[in-house]
Structure formats: C-alpha cells, structure tokens
Amino acid sequence: MIIHNLGIKDYTEIWEQMKAFTAIRDSNSCDELWLLEHYPVYTQGQAGKPEHVLNPNSIKIVQSDRGGQVTYHGPGQLVAYVLMDIRRRNLGIRTLVAKLEEILISVLKHYKIPANIRSGAPGVYVGEKKIASIGLRVKNGCTYHGIALNVNMDLSPFLGINPCGFAKMEMTQMSHFHPNIQLEEVSQHFVQYFLTQFK
C-alpha cells in the first residue's frame, strides 16, 4: 500500500488523476491511499438528483462517477481516496464499505467520539448527525473515490443541499467535541487504522 499526502487540491483535477491511475493499473500495480482536502465543491454521485441541490450559491457543482448522492467537500475535511484492487484482495464492495466504516469508527473512538452506522445509509454518524461519508466507484475490479470525514471545517455549505439525498440531514464534525483538533493528526490516526485492515 502506497500512501500519498497531497495537501489541498481541486476536485476535478484529482478525479481525473484517479481515473487515469485506475485505467492503466494492472494486476501487479500497488494499491494506493490518497489523503487530501478539497477546495469548496459540491459533488453529485451517480444516484444524485438535481432537486437535492437546494441553494449552491457560488460553490461549483461537479457531476461525479462515484456511488451515492450529493455531498460537499471543503477545507478542514479529511478526504481519503482508496485506489484498491478488490478483485486481487478477494473483497466485495459491501465488505470494503463495512471495513471503511469500521476504520472511521475506530478513529472517532480514539477521540472518545461515540459513532455508529445506519442500515441502508452508508457512512458514519454521531447520534442522528452524519460525520463521515463514503462513496466509491469500481472499474475492472478496482476502486477509486473513498471517504470524507468532517474534522474542523465550515459546515454551512451542507445547508445548501440534502446531504446524501436525505432532507434535513444534520452534519457534525470532530471539532464539536475537540475544538483544537488538527486534521494532520487525524489523518495519521486514519492511516494507522487503515493499515491494520489493509496491508
């Protein structure tokens, strides 16, 4: 597993790089984990509906090829893209999603934030509020896209959408529990737990 820390990046630029990486990889290619933040952007998944974008203001909307519906990415949110040959690892997509949820819950538990999952609604929640989203694409047995964990960000752009297609879905973030939390530190813990699941 090769890990890249990419800093803050434009969504479309990284999306194109993920597609290019996946298109040229073969059975000998190493899996990769890309860690980054995005400049403000709304992304529509393949199941996304235009009516779930309520008031985008000046924030760009990108129609993506990942699973799921609409979400928001912005600075202070940890994004981890999982470029993995799940066929080689003999992993189903549902198993991968479940493992990613486990990893996120472990990270949050480390900070004593009580997190849970919901049946039929991928992602991770604290009570009724969503703290992390998951959306993947599989092509030729290989995944791209991944997870987004709200660490210490401006959550107000989520009010301009129905997050993940759920009207009035409230969002939360780690800084509500730990005001001085740093994204870089959270990223390190995420990698640690990720590598316990995926060598």
Curated annotation (Swiss-Prot):
Main location as per UniProt: cytoplasm
EC number: 2.3.1.181
Catalytic site: 164 (acyl-thioester intermediate)
Single GO MF annotation: lipoyl(octanoyl) transferase activity
Listed PROSITE patterns: BPL_LPL_CATALYTIC, LIPB
Keywords for this protein: Acyltransferase, Cytoplasm, Transferase
Gene3D superfamilies cross-referenced by the UniProt entry: Bira Bifunctional Protein, Domain 2
InterPro entries listed in its UniProt record: aa-tRNA-synth_II/BPL/LPL (IPR045864), BPL_LPL_catalytic (IPR004143), Octanoyltransferase (IPR000544), Octanoyltransferase_CS (IPR020605)
One GO BP: protein modification process
Site features described as Lowers pKa of active site Cys, chain residue numbers: 130
Pathway the protein contributes to: Protein modification; protein lipoylation via endogenous pathway; protein N(6)-(lipoyl)lysine from octanoyl-[acyl-carrier-protein]: step 1/2
Gene Ontology, cellular component aspect: cytoplasm
Binding site for substrate: 66-73, 133-135, 146-148
Keyword Cytoplasm among record annotations: yes
Domain BPL/LPL catalytic, first and last residues per copy: 27-199
The reaction(s) this protein catalyses: octanoyl-[ACP] + L-lysyl-[protein] = N(6)-octanoyl-L-lysyl-[protein] + holo-[ACP] + H(+)
Localization of this protein: Cytoplasm
Record's miscellaneous remark: In the reaction, the free carboxyl group of octanoic acid is attached via an amide linkage to the epsilon-amino group of a specific lysine residue of lipoyl domains of lipoate-dependent enzymes.
Protein family: Belongs to the LipB family.
Function comment: Catalyzes the transfer of endogenously produced octanoic acid from octanoyl-acyl-carrier-protein onto the lipoyl domains of lipoate-dependent enzymes. Lipoyl-ACP can also act as a substrate although octanoyl-ACP is likely to be the physiological substrate.
PANTHER family in alphabetical order: LIPOYLTRANSFERASE 2, MITOCHONDRIAL-RELATED, OCTANOYLTRANSFERASE
Protein name: Octanoyltransferase
